[in-house]
UniProtKB/Swiss-Prot annotation:
Cofactor: Zn(2+)
The protein's role, per its UniProt record: Part of the Sec protein translocase complex. Interacts with the SecYEG preprotein conducting channel. Has a central role in coupling the hydrolysis of ATP to the transfer of proteins into and across the cell membrane, serving both as a receptor for the preprotein-SecB complex and as an ATP-driven molecular motor driving the stepwise translocation of polypeptide chains across the membrane.
Binding site for Zn(2+): C892, C894, C903, H904
Gene behind the chain: secA
Protein's recorded name: Protein translocase subunit SecA
Length: 907
């Protein structure tokens, strides 16, 4: 009440925005006579002039009136269409990074060309995002003549596109594509092994068509890239025969002919020299290793991992202690609680090794390698805007989540559609019969076309069956074949047309009263001018007949949970001032009525003693349904907002990893990185044997020497150093060992040569980063699955999630460093041929990725995780918890005085 009173005095925010924008429109219109007088060549030459002015420091806002006037004049000459003033307002809205709500049929596609043209002048690229490939291709081809006349390049991206073609499309001034493809390309770009393989050149400015569908309905849809599950079952089965031929060494330090020694504390195994030789011979006999080839050559490290997993499976993991067999599957037993953990799987190939040991079918892993949500992807753009026919009902969410204001653009002509009250029936059968009867009544009265919107395919089939029984010809759409869908929707305004469509089908294509004569002309082979004149004359007659019959009739077979979806269906009729009628038919059995409409409405209808074919029509009922829809919308918004808090944690970690990956790819040499890794790993390793601030009696020097020998392949006389220099403390020891290890690494590096060493370093760093990031994603999923239970312990699940996620992230960084240092220390110096083979393997690995597109349940905090879960036990060391700072250049919260990227955020 108060809000409407204030709005009446001062005007609403939307009215104030429109008033401001109309002044800019006046400036554009004032330029029209001058711009119209330009020749085609002079008009086209305006684009390089604008680009030069922009490069000289003039802002796009300053260029806007003249650029819009040029774009409008070019559209008039090339496309035969002139932008209305309301379309200019829409273009200003898009340029300012807002959402333009424009009614169906008001020309959103043409409106978008204004903001595209202006923002393309910066040279940073504009992305136009649509809901399907057909619309992307259609809009790109429709606008291509205009943009090419103005000297701008245009590209389209789609799935399974040739890499060179896709790269060229991204280099174009304006790039069209679907939300899925843009999102997948972002993920793929962060899995490449050289900067030259990247396709996207930055996320500068995006215009999202049907923005409500993408940013609200699909907000939590995860884009997932998963590794094609390589069928390694034969490898696990073959290597499973090796462990029974081996025996453990009883003591780590005493060579007694054993093939490996067991570290039960760390649940790891290390092979002895005899073990290496034995395993190599076995692998050669199996044909898995070439004669004379080393197990520790760079290209064979995967075999080392397989053998290690097989030995661990046989000697460290016992049936009915660490796992049980149930229905032919290995189920992990939690060692702390004794409970089984269905759905969880050990990582690093251990689970498959246990399956091979038990003679079970080896389950391939289709692991998530990269994932993001549309919510997080689109928030990466420097400037984001969108257009739709229905966004005002979700304006609060658009503002809070994405920082986007919604501006309602007035219609070019007044809206005269007749939106009638809902009719409510006792049951679905009564409702469907009433719909069929209404269709027959409309057909008897004239030639008005009818569009029936359904919420489900099942409802479409029921109505289609009843229409067939009544002998009424009709079309059915289910939003699967986009091109056919658009064609049928385009003709859905023809006289006597009856079309059944799911509520979302055919979005982006206008329903023209009388049908679309241009689409009919395009289907003819070699059409003549006579054909064109005939079809146009026929359309003019059909158009007039449909107008006289009251325009398009919309019949909704039920209400959706969201008012916005209902408004989309209604918005099919009444385009550009055309007449039209809309009405929803409901029943007490509809989900929304059954769950949300309230007992009062249901009780009232039952008390009236209505029969199946009788309906109630009252504003109170319609209001009650709208109130129910508002409650559902508010609940869904709260769920999305709450889940976004958790997603934001993952998103920050993703940005750090991807940024680090780009830095690695951009560096010519990683020597400085790798040497720093050596120092950090040495510090952590030494701390395991020489605890900080401990006395000499607590030092396990022998254990440290063995660890250096086994993990890094380096013999250091640590005990001798201590005996020679009694003043050598813990800090001095760390420095001396680090210097020795790095000196040895530099020696090996010199033997390889700078170029080969740089390639090997990049190979191991990227491989380790990608492998552990994949495992980290699974661990984060598992953490999230049960985090809500912390609420029962009077803890804040959100804070607990942030704390645990940070610990997991820091631990992952530590494991990556350890892996890189260990692999680089133990790998045999590769030949140029082996390096080339490694590079080829990397490329094969990149090409073996497959895409998987899934919907995530919005209530994902309590739902089961369908992906295989990775063990969280890989890094059990307690870590101090610090919050992740907003910027990687901010001081690290640990208090070290270093930047975060050089401290806890460093790889």
């Amino acid at each position: 009440m108060l809000a409407s009173l204030i709005g009446g005095i001062f005007g609403t925010k939307n009215e104030r925005e429109l008033k401001r924008m109309r002044k800019i429109v006046e400036q554009i219109n004032a330029l029209e006579p001058t711009i119209s007088a330009l020749s085609d060549a002079d008009l086209s030459a305006k684009t390089p002039e604008f680009k030069q002015r922009y490069n000289n420091g003039e802002s796009l806002d300053k260029l806007l009136p003249e650029a819009f006037a040029v774009c409008r004049e070019a559209a008039k000459r090339v496309m035969g269409m002139r932008h209305y003033d309301v379309q200019l307002i829409g273009g200003i809205t898009l340029h300012e990074g807002k959402i333009a709500e424009m009614r169906t049929g008001e020309g959103k596609t043409l409106m978008g060309t204004l903001a595209c043209y202006l923002n393309a002048l910066s040279g940073e690229g504009v992305h136009v995002i649509t809901v399907n490939d057909y619309l992307a291709q259609r809009d790109a081809e429709l606008n291509r003549p205009l943009f090419e006349f103005l000297g701008l390049s245009i590209g389209t991206i789609y799935s399974m596109q040739e890499p060179a073609e896709k790269a060229a499309a991204y280099l174009a001034d304006i790039t069209y594509g679907t939300n899925n493809e843009f999102g997948f390309d972002y993920l793929r770009d962060n899995m490449v092994f050289s900067l030259a393989e990247k396709k996207q050149r930055g996320l500068h400015y995006a215009i999202i068509d049907e923005v409500d569908s993408i940013l609200i309905d699909e907000a939590r849809t995860p884009l997932i890239i998963s590794g094609q599950s390589e069928d390694s079952s034969h490898l696990y089965t073959a290597i499973n025969t090796i462990p029974p031929k081996l025996r453990p060494q009883k003591e780590e330090k005493v060579a007694d002919g054993g093939h490996f020694w067991i570290d039960e504390k760390q649940r790891s195994v290390e092979m002895t020299e005899i073990g290496y030789e034995t395993v190599e011979q076995e692998l050669i006999q199996m044909g898995l290793l070439a004669e004379g080839e080393s197990l520790y050559s760079a290209t064979n490290l995967n075999l080392v991992h397989h053998v290690s997993a097989a030995i661990r499976a046989h000697f460290l993991f016992q049936r009915d202690v660490h796992y049980i067999i149930h229905d032919g599957e290995v189920i992990i037993v939690d060692e702390h609680t004794g409970r089984t953990m269905p759905g969880r799987r050990w990582s690093e190939g251990l689970h498959q090794a246990v399956e091979a040991k038990e003679g079970l079918a080896i389950q391939p892993e289709n692991q998530t390698l990269a994932t993001t949500t549309f919510q997080n992807y689109f928030r990466l753009y420097k400037k984001l805007s969108g257009m739709t026919g229905t966004a005002d009902t979700e304006a609060a969410e658009m503002k809070e989540i994405y920082g986007l204001d919604v501006v309602i653009i007035p219609t070019h002509r007044p809206m005269i559609r007749n939106d009638q009250n809902d009719l409510i029936y006792l049951n679905r059968n009564g409702k469907y019969n009433a719909i069929i009867q209404e269709i027959m009544n409309i057909r008897q009265q004239g030639v008005a076309p009818i569009l029936i919107g359904t919420a489900t395919i099942e409802a479409s089939e029921i109505l289609s069956s009843k229409l067939k029984q009544a002998g009424i010809h009709h079309e059915v759409l289910n939003a699967k074949q986009h091109e056919r869908e658009a064609d049928i929707i385009a003709q859905a305004g023809s006289p006597n047309a009856v079309t059944i469509a799911t509520n979302m089908a055919g979005r982006g294509t206008d329903i023209i009263l009388g049908g679309n004569w241009k689409a009919k002309l395009a289907k003819l082979e070699n059409p003549t001018p006579e054909d064109e004149a005939r079809l146009k004359a026929q359309w003019e007659q059909d158009h007039e007949d449909v107008l006289q019959a009251g325009g398009l009739h919309i019949i909704g077979s039920e209400r959706h949970e969201s008012r916005r979806i209902d408004n989309q269906l209604r918005g099919r009729a009444g385009r550009q001032g055309d007449p039209g009628v809309s009405r929803f038919y409901l029943s007490l059995e509809d989900d929304l009525m059954r769950i949300f409409a309230g007992d009062r409405v249901v009780a009232m209808m039952r008390a009236m003693g209505l029969k199946e074919d009788e309906a109630i029509e009252h504003k109170m009922v319609s209001r009650s349904i709208e109130n129910a829809q508002r409650k559902v919308e508010a609940r869904n918004f709260d769920i999305r907002k709450n889940l976004l808090k958790y997603d934001d944690v993952n998103n920050e970690q993703r940005k750090i990893i991807y940024s680090q990956r780009d830095e690695i790819l951009a560096e010519n040499t990683l020597q400085e990185y790798v040497e720093e890794m050596h120092r950090e790993v040495m510090q952590a390793m030494i701390a395991n044997f020489i605890p900080p601030e401990s006395i000499h009696d607590q030092w396990d020097v022998e254990g440290l020497e063995n660890a250096l020998r086994i993990d890094l392949g380096i013999e250091l006389p640590v005990q001798e150093w201590l005996e020679q220099d009694r003043r050598l403390d813990e800090e001095g020891l760390v420095e001396r060992i680090s210097d020795e290890v790095i000196a040895r690494y530099r020696q090996r590096r010199a033997q390889m040569g700078d170029e080969s060493a740089a390639m090997l370093e990049r190979h191991f760093v990227l491989n380790s980063l990608d492998r552990h990031w994949k495992d980290h994603l699974a661990a984060m999923d598992y953490l999230r699955q049960g985090i809500h239970l912390r609420g029962y312990a009077q803890k804040n699940p959100e804070q607990e999630y942030k704390k645990e996620a940070f610990n997991l992230f820091v631990n992952m960084l530590g494991v990556i460093k350890t892996d890189v240092v260990t692999d680089l220390s133990r790998v045999h110096i590769p030949t140029p041929e082996e390096l080339a083979e490694m590079e080829a393997q990397q490329q094969q690995q990149a090409e073996a990725m497959k895409l998987s597109f899934e919907h995530d349940d919005v209530d994902g905090l309590t739902g089961e995780v369908t992906a295989s879960q990775e063990a969280l036990n890989d890094s059990a060391t307690e870590q101090q918890t610090f919050p992740v700072p907003e910027s990687r250049n901010a001081p690290c919260p640990c208090g070290s005085g270093l930047k975060y990227k050089q401290c806890h955020g460093k790889i």
